[in-house]
Amino acid sequence: MDTMITTPLILILITCGANSQTVKPDTASESDQPTWSNPLFTYPEGCTLDKLSKVNASQLRCPRIFDDENRGLIAYPTSIRSLSVGNDLGDIHTQGNHIHKVLYRTICSTGFFGGQTIEKALVKMKLSTKEAGAYDTTTAAALYFPAPRCQWYTDNVQNDLIFYYTTQKSVLRDPYTRDFLDSDFIGGKCTKSPCQTHWSNVVWMGDAGIPACDSSQEIKAHLFVDKISNRVVKATSYGHHPWGLHQACMIEFCGQQWIRTDLGDLISVVYNSGSEILSFPKCEDKTVGMRGNLDDFAYLDDLVKASESREECLEAHAEIISTNSVTPYLLSKFRSPHPGINDVYAMHKGSIYHGMCMTVAVDEVSKDRTTYRAHRATSFTKWERPFGDEWEGFHGLHGNNTTIIPDLEKYVAQYKMSMMEPMSIKSVPHPSILALYNETDVSGISIRKLDSFDLQSLHWSFWPTISALGGIPFVLLLAVAACCCWSGRPPTPSVPQSIPMYHLANRS
């Protein structure tokens, strides 16, 4: 191996070992870690539609996969208190609303001969966080375009209505910093509601969320110690990813001392029947944040494995982006194999939906595949379908009469081909664009910025175009041509009764 490569690796291992704590618990025990770490299947529970939002294909993320091989390690019973969401997802979601400011504009163009073109446009208005809370809002169902205001021989007569309305949107809340977290926010986070979003006319407002410094209830867990060095390697508990302790250190937060794990979780650990408290050297910095904000490479020691599964997911992601389509099989690659709070994905009518939800380990699937039994459960449960129908579920699960689970179907010799059927992916529209009712008298509906209203984008009919080109000169030219043609005709013999002139005028 090249010395340029080995030297950094040795330094990493030395650094990781420097903070490790040596302990000698009194009682060893069997851990149930292998039971849930690689279960038959995992599936979300309680993941309702209000916890999901549309994302583009580029926003899909492959799950972390942790190596739970415990060779050379001894498990000891312990209790863990976490200043994180622990096994309960309730506190991590904060309910709120997108507040939109949109101008509904009806445009009428009337030609010289009375022909009309009516266009309707949504015009984005700038909305500040101060303005967002100052006006009464309505719901999306109450929106409407104003009646056209038309004037003879005039183009682009506008009739405008401004609406402030809300659409439901839940976001995540960092239990440490109390920041609101969502890809809609500038920089992905916001410290205080209301929050500015990437869209100039949309602001997010939500409730206060979880109180600061709340810790979860004590969790029964296991502490894993190296047999030879007696150094603490990790801690585990059902429904949570392993807490890596290779680079753990002590940090003060909310007036208490906490262990900051490799991925940034804050926990406290007691062992030997509660008589001993696990501690580490003091952290060199005071960074706190939701897990995953710290250096992920800490898990390269022994907690991240299954590079094949990770590579399969990355290849699936590349295929989805390049083809702009997804199959249930490809979507199944984004399922986390570990229970706990994970990213979940579903497809519905060409859109990809994403959420952060609690997933459970599935120990058994019924013979007809319609139900499953979760780990430690005594009864079977139906698969949750977030869209209320009997076809689409999470991570490629689909089917009506027969439930097809791509992760399990791939092992069947005669697998169902429906899991290979591609679905075209729709891009996520601007959040202010809604299903626009039964607008039958309109040549086009578009959304525009206030400062870029473009007359060339109008959809013209023939007669208003005449007026735009200059109706009167055009009509005069026609009249002159008609007179010339008329005067050039040979004279006709007189008749006893002539056609009244107003008849001739009506025909021209």
From Swiss-Prot:
InterPro entries: Rhabdo_glycop_CD, Rhabdo_glycop_FD, Spike_prot. The gene is G. It is found in: Virion membrane. Belongs to the novirhabdovirus glycoprotein family. Keywords: Glycoprotein, Host-virus interaction, Membrane, Signal, Transmembrane, Transmembrane helix, Viral attachment to host cell, Viral envelope protein, Virion, Virus entry into host cell. Residues 1-20 form the signal peptide. Residues 21-461 are virion surface. The chain crosses the membrane at residues 462-482. This is Glycoprotein. Its main location: virion. Homotrimer. Residues 483-508 are intravirion. Binds to specific receptor at cellular surface, bringing about the attachment of the virus particle to the cell. Plays a major role in the determination of host range restriction and virulence. Class I viral fusion protein. Responsible for penetration of the viral nucleocapsid into the cell cytoplasm by mediating the fusion of the membrane of the endocytosed virus particle with the endosomal membrane. Low pH in endosomes induce an irreversible conformational change in G, releasing a fusion hydrophobic peptide. It comes from the Viruses. The keyword Signal applies. It is a single-pass type I membrane protein. One of its GO terms (cellular component) is virion membrane. One of its GO terms (biological process) is virion attachment to host cell. Pfam families: Rhabdo_glycop_CD, Rhabdo_glycop_FD. Glycans are attached at residues 56, 400-401, 438.
